């Protein structure tokens, strides 16, 4: 039995969240009656309203009246009035991942997991399958520029989804094809230990059916170790590693783009194949690796070399992934979601490859607990930045932790040899600081998962106003 067509209304608590909004949009496009609520107005809320979805701002018990099912994410607290009302009225309450799993049961599915790179890789797989006329349904964790949204309903038999590991619910997703980009210590508030994180990713791959396959990056030592532990499943490895089944070769930066080739090795048939002259309109080794994962899936599903080559060259990117928001006096302003040390290092390396002048990083640390648990890593991930501007920690609902704040982070960076580290007193002061240190050709990269994206879009205009 699958999700009945006549069920509804389906009420989403926190419908404006990036994961929730995508599922709500696809359900709406499938013909289900969808409604929801969110704590505040947002671009996602506005977009869903344009599709005819009724959305209330603020959480109230009466919002769930008449609903047949209530969908919640892990961000919703147990004392949320809508959740309490749903349970009091015996309305079924399901987690976001459970509803996503119901949608996935309607299609053959590619699920993309990993500590970093999920959103970009999901977008790349979607772009390649689009080009191959698969017309996939897509549910992503970021806004795909080609769609102007993070979700779309396709008429084809395939679905491409981002698998969020943060709360462990990605293990509920019935994927036929799984991608694992990397595995790093993250979300330890849920998993408690890094060993538990690794075990979850192992289970994710082993959930793939015998007729499916997993694509795993063996440039990452933890993923390489996982490959050796997984039995009875078909694994396709990728990376620059000479042992990879799908190998990234001859990677060269080309301004804000990358060129490379990919070599395939079929161990069973003992054959080799190569796709040369690949161009990706994004900088950075990490993005080339993400593209290699997408190419591995596309090749396995039968796309031609020319289709892969053209689709990759035309890839439009993802919002908040090395997104240029504007420029001033020859200075490029970049917005990026990077908020983990591994992500920050990769983004700054890409910026370094894109300019011959300075890279100026502006970082808004995200969550006190993350800064505390990875403090040493944060102090050593800015090596490709000539200057680091540090904002206050974005709490994301957390209480402050003594000694874990902007000023101690500044001291930590200086203690690790950074010569120019500037504490930002308030967001309104950012334009003045950048104006005083940036020169033509420089890249100013704003990093974080909080509201720093708003600063990134405002900064070009503020700089122009200063002259």
Curated annotation (Swiss-Prot):
Tell me which domain of life the UniProt entry assigns to the organism this sequence originates from. Bacteria
Catalytic activity reads: UDP-N-acetyl-alpha-D-muramate + L-alanine + ATP = UDP-N-acetyl-alpha-D-muramoyl-L-alanine + ADP + phosphate + H(+)
- Using the record, list the residue span of the signal peptide; answer none if the entry has no such feature: none
Which GO terms of the cellular component aspect does the record hold?
cytoplasm
Asked whether the keyword Secreted is assigned, the reply is no
Gene Ontology BP annotations: cell division; cell wall organization; peptidoglycan biosynthetic process; regulation of cell shape
Q: What would you give as a GO molecular function for this chain, any one?
A: UDP-N-acetylmuramate-L-alanine ligase activity
**Where does the protein end up?**
Cytoplasm
Enzyme type, top EC level: ligase
Q: Which UniProt keywords apply?
A: ATP-binding, Cell cycle, Cell division, Cell shape, Cell wall biogenesis/degradation, Cytoplasm, Ligase, Nucleotide-binding, Peptidoglycan synthesis
What is the name of the protein in this document? UDP-N-acetylmuramate--L-alanine ligase
Listed EC numbers: 6.3.2.8
Q: What does this protein do?
A: Cell wall formation.
Record keywords: DNA damage included?
Answer: no
Q: Which family does it belong to?
A: Belongs to the MurCDEF family.
Q: Gene for this protein?
A: murC
Residues engaged in binding ATP: 114-120
